Amino acid sequence: MATVTQTGTTQIRVASPTGPVTRTILRTPLRDALPSEIPIIDVSPIFSSSLEDRKSVAQQVRNAATNTGFFYIKNHGVPNHVTQESYNAALEFFRQDVDKKNEASITKSARYNGYRAPDTQRVNPDEGIDVRESFSITYDPRIDTEVNKVQEIPENVMEYIRMEEGHWENTSNLPNFKRSVINHYQSCLSLARALTRTFALSLDLPETAFDSKVVYPDAGINMNYYPPIPNNQSLTPTDPNARVSIGSHTDFPVFTILWQDNVGGLQVLSRDGQWINAKPIPDTFVVNIADCLQRITNDKYVSTIHRAQNWSGKERVSIGFFWGFGFHETCAVLDNCLAPGEKKKYEDINCWEWLKKRVYDMTQLDEECKKSS
C-alpha cells in the first residue's frame, strides 16, 4: 500500500517498463504544468512537402519525449466535428442504465472489445478502486482505410487479430454510436501513422523506418467516463471507500493520443515527483510516450506515470487512442539510441509477448501490495 515517509513525501509502487518500481511523491499542492514540462507543439508541418519542416516538428517532439514524455499537439488535422460527435456518442452510451451497458460487456469478447463497468478494476493496487467506466475497441482491419483486402493479410498477422461484432450489435440501439466511434478511430489511425514518421525523424532514423511495423498495428480506443469523486486523499488504499478515477500507471505500446473534454483531471508525475495538471486545451490532443517506445530507445524517451482524478463535481469524458507496433512485430532496442560503449538494457521481444509481460508485471504488483497490506 502507499506509505508516508519523511515529512512532505509519500511513496507508491507502480508497474513500469522496467518492472514494479517505487516512486517518491512530493506532497506539494497540485499545480498546472508549465509549458516547459508539457509543451504545445504545432504539428501542421508534419503534413508539409518540406522535409526540413517535418524535421522541425521532430526536434520539438524529441525535446518533449526526453523530458516529461507528454506534449500537446495542435493543428493535427482531426476535424472538431469528429471529436464532438464521438464525445456526444460517449455521453449517450454511458448515461444509459447499467443493465443496458452490460449487454456490450467486455467479458463477452475474446479481444477486449466492449464495456467495462466501474469498480471492476484497480489499475494501481497501491491506490483505491477505479471508478472509471470504459468502452474499448481493438484493431480491426475492416475499418482501417489503409487495408485493401482483409483476405490477403498474412497468416502470421491474422493470428493476433480478432474481428468481432458483438460490441457493435449490443450498442445498435444508439444509431450514431458505431459511426461516431469509428470516425474518431480512423482519424486517429491516420494521425498516428503520420506521427510515427515524426518519431522516426526525431530518432535520426529514415522517416519510413517504422512504416512496416504499423501496417497492421496494435491500435485501440478507450472511451472513458469518469463520474465525479470527492477529493479525499486521506483514505488509505485498503479503506473500502477509497476510490480513484483511474490509478497511477504508464501506457503499454508506443504512444497514446488522448482527447479530453473541458472538465480536466489528467495528472502527470513530473520528473521531480510532483503531480501536475495536464489541463484541457481546446482543439488539442495530449500525446504521451508509452512503454514500448521507452524500451526501444533504451530509456532515452520517457514513459511517464500518470493518473486521472475527477474532483470537479461534474462528469468527465476522455478518449484515448493507444498506438503500437503490430503484435507480430519485434520490440528491439535501436542501435542508434546507444552511445559508444553503451549496452542494451533490454532483450528483443515479440510485441505480443511484451504486452503479456506488462500485464503480468501489473499482476505481480497486485500480489506485492496484498502481501504488504
Task: Identify the role of each PLM range.
Residues A2-S373:
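Peripheral, non-catalytic segments flanking oxidoreductase cores
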